[in-house]
Amino acid sequence: MEAQTLYEKLWSSHVVHQEADGTALIYIDRHLVHEVTSPQAFEGLKLAGRKPWRISSIVATADHNIPTDHWEMGIQDPVSRQQVETLDANIREVGSLAYFPFKDQRQGIIHVIGPENGTTLPGMTVVCGDSHTSTHGAFACLAHGIGTSEVEHVMATQCLLQKKSKTMLIKVEGTLGRGVTAKDVVLAIIGRIGTAGGTGYAIEFGGSAIRSLSMEGRMTVCNMAIEAGARAGLVAVDETTIDYLKDKPFAPKGPQWDAAVAYWRTLKSDDGATFDTVVELDATSILPQVTWGTSPEMVTTVDGRVPDPAAIADPVKREGVERALKYMGLAPNTPISEIAVDQVFIGSCTNSRIEDLREAAAVVKGRSKAASVRRVLVVPGSGLVKHQAEAEGLDKVFIEAGFEWREPGCSMCLAMNADRLEPGERCASTSNRNFEGRQGAGGRTHLVSPAMAAAAAVTGHFTDVRTLN
């Protein structure tokens, strides 16, 4: 039998029908649903007189629009409140495998609660009306975002029309240095291949540095595969994967667990499998990263400088850098360490899991928020993460430092709720996108790891976290 990549195994095992032009009908195992991209889909089903094909595939929660403080006051914004109430009504009418409504102790960001509850399992196809569904590829799932019309299509048919992607292997070999995290790894990768480098590809992340990451770290890497232009990000199953899933509420039990694990162990690229493209990075060369512009590929090391457009020969790239620097309010050649921040956000589906909060708390402990920093938000990714963090006393570390400890939700990752930047404010953020206006009109976003965000919070500017430990 011909050697196959992990992507090819996942693809071939889910093809229902294939056309001569390569278009295929793919079966979907898990459908993640939230309040923003689902109302139109449910309405379309009702108008057509249809019901969801397999409600046991649906896992739903409210995350984008919900507030992260003063839950006793409910949702103040009328549009946000309507979306959340509509999701609640739709799910209660049609049913689901699992639904974690607003204020439920297990509620949280959809890409956090899926894995932590065991509803994301290796070998699945996973879709959601959300770009960062690629997160679930950390479990050797074929996972990607879909549009609202496709949300309805999946609900109605349990299938999706797709074309097969090319395959890319990104190998990160070696040992990561002190203070270097999964977020730094994926930002370094995007800095290397660019935001279009993965276009048309499913990226498998491999190498000793990737294998050394926890599942939380692997989710961070796969979460941002979409920011490299990829359709999906993947990591092969190993003992780390299996240990994480054991005893999760929706994971198989007893003999079914044993059978599942036996299958999961096959979910890796075969020896001799051929990738369309291979990229290699030396883990020892990766340093803490900070983005300086309005795209994740506009990134450098914490000891670096903002680029000088005058030194860029390509006129298109030069113009792009000039525009980014103007929006970000930065002068060419400014040292990254001299850039002051107004707010800090520790959260999002990229970096709001327990490991992320531990990393930030380790930096913050015994220190205080810099007087020049207006606000620091720490937003756990789910109620379960929040509960665990509080059991470990992490909330007290943040509160004593002058940070705000919030309820779970998407929060300041995107300006769809009350947590946002004011025009001109600069934020050190653990989220995944630094586009213009992403965190609020006129807001300026710099992407960093939780540890680096914590360092900026206590010093008032971007600081090499390795100098604080």
Swiss-Prot record:
One of its GO terms (biological process) is L-leucine biosynthetic process. [4Fe-4S] cluster binds at residues 349, 410, 413. Keywords: 4Fe-4S, Amino-acid biosynthesis, Branched-chain amino acid biosynthesis, Iron, Iron-sulfur, Leucine biosynthesis, Lyase, Metal-binding. Pathway: Amino-acid biosynthesis; L-leucine biosynthesis; L-leucine from 3-methyl-2-oxobutanoate: step 2/4. Its EC number is 4.2.1.33. Heterodimer of LeuC and LeuD. This is 3-isopropylmalate dehydratase large subunit. It comes from Azoarcus sp. (strain BH72).
